Amino acid sequence: MLLTLGTIVESQTPPAAVADSIYKAAVNGGPESWKTAAEELRALLPGTPDSPTMHALLGGLYLRLGEQDSSRSALERAIQIDSTLASAHFGLGRVHLELRDKPKDAVRHFEAALRADSTYADAHAQLSLAYQKQGKRRLARRQADLAIRYEPRLALPYRILAETYAEDKNRAASLIYFKRYLDRNPEDQETATTFCYELLEEEEWEQLFEVTSRLNDSRTLPLLATALIHKGEHEAALAAFRDYMATLEEEEAELYDDITPVGLKREALAYRTTIGKTREAFLDRFWMIRDPFKTSGGAMRRAEHYRRVWHARRHFGIKRFPWDRRGAVYIRYGEPFWRSTSKDMNAIVPAEAQQVQDLMASRLYGSESIDHTFVGPVYPIRHQSDAGLSLSGSPNGANGTLGLQGYKPVTAGSDWSTVPWESWIYTDIANGIEISFTDEFLSGNFDYAPIPTLSEDDFARFERGSGSPLTFISRLTELAPAALVAHVVSEKPDRYDLALLEPLHFYYEALAYRGEDGQTDLQINIALPIDNVAMDEDPDTTVVVERRVVLLRGAQEISRSVENLAVGINDMNRDQGLLAVERVDVKVQPGEYELRVQASRRNTNRVQVYGQILELEDFGKTDLMLSDLQIAQNVVEANPDRPSKFGRKGWDIQPAPARSFRAGEPLFVYYEIYNLNRDEFGQTRYQIGCEVETTTSEGKIKIPFLAKLRKKQGEKIGFEFEQTGTETDENDFFELDLSEAKPGSYELRMRVTDLTNQQTTSKHSMFTVSPTR
């Protein structure tokens, strides 16, 4: 921090005025400027040897230059001349605090400065820092508050408040002051990094993104990536991790791509035997297969893997490279549902975790475990050998202490463990497992809790009772953490938890038409219910929904379309059952594909993805063919002056992806017919037939809806129509009259017969009718 000298209110002699000018000109420069200014002030001293201002200014320059003895001598001389000179006391305090690292000695000088000027904000701030360095957080906060009262623009007091509140585990207050500090001093990368780790612990993802996106310290790239993961921006998160990996040594960087901790043996072997582009292609496929949504090219799962590796290096790789056993489990399975450690015992055990504990305890200790509450490992770990020695013929003592002579579980009433321990519970792996880790050598290197060794006293107690030591040893071996993990890895090599996500239900439909050059025009219509997108706390606002449409063939991504959709939310469109409709067009070769359609509201955990296997027929054949039937809300002739995003072949088709209508509403069906044959007069003649069925308790029954076919010369009503024309391909629509329709689900079948050669083709579609309001 720069030295701020108090305004000297005294009669200035010309040399003193010159000295003040020299100081001000040099204060914002560098060491050379300070050194030159100090020489100029020394040259002025013989003319004004008793000027406290001259000595104080000279001491300030020496302080900047880090010259402890010269600075201290000049400032002490200034105080000898004028003991009320606040700036001299302040400077001397900083000499003790910064150059001598003696915060206790600095306190009395800052206090002297404040006796001379109680509103001296910098002195309050430096006194606060001196108290903080002595561990006197309460006094430090009091002085920081005073500094802010007198000068709110100072940055240092906010940092001290942030750090002291963080030390007191008051993260809410700490975050407030860290943010205010960085607003005033955004260039402090070190403090910003500390702040980011606080935000990480508090899971303040939006703030973490805001801060880390402004930093250029490579150490914060994993923090930025983590924030991006929680924002749903997985490709950007993956890019941030790769930028971070590029700054690491080769041995460290390779840890992130190595899939050995999460892959099967054959996959790990394949990884080790590939290099270069072949390895990258292998990794792309590996992560795509494991990606639960398959809408980001595997980035969703891969970015999470990188995050876990970074977390394991940071938390579990301190004493062992690259990480101890906890890190290996964390990379494979992620954050446990419940965790308790010997350093931070977690006595709040959710019902799901308690169920896992109780089942394991019952298998190990029988009915004796019923009255015990477990707050640590259920599996017995090393304890003091004289704790609970009275075992009554079983591994459970008559005094209620479970376990063996030297190994016991950790319960609410008994923790005599002699080794550091951690207990992790995953409720969604193998119907729930507990994994216990211990640091047997007190080295900070945790491994699976070892299988206990029975003492002679343990065997003797079994012999006196009805239990079998061999049976108990068998259970200990079967339920040992190492054995449990080895068993579940063979069935579930990795885990990706989606439990924190909330569903965002929407509707979609996929329709296929003939395209150009032998391709198929795949049309995906999406309808987002406004009421599903909106949240209760939303004001009248516009929110962003990211829409993704991905087409896959196996693990290969054929096409990906991503777009951010602005959805307006206000009192007028809430609770109205309204839909925001979007259309995506994909040109693709015929064949079998997997379609993935995803919608996620940005900056929330609301997301939904739907998958569907598509068999896209080859419309390039010469036989009579019919496109998919599009159930629509309306079909009108397209206006060439106002093109619509829902237009196709001269028609403006308003999609109805939900395919839900109310009785009395019109229902339109758009279709395309291909490869009609002309007769000897160049005419085409074909017949369209429609059937509508619904399913009741008595089975399927046909419904006599009237269909109204659009014709250039008028409209024709009926369930079979004969049409004539001259084109071999037709695209048209008809309207169904739902005025008499009852609520329920209906199947529409359309059949086309070419009356020239008697070829027939058909398609079907579904729709529902809801009760009128």
Label for each model-derived stretch:
Residues 133-135, 167-169, 200-204, 218-520:
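Residues within mature, well-folded domains
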Residues 47, 81, 116, 150, ...:
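Structural marker of alpha-solenoid helical repeat scaffolds
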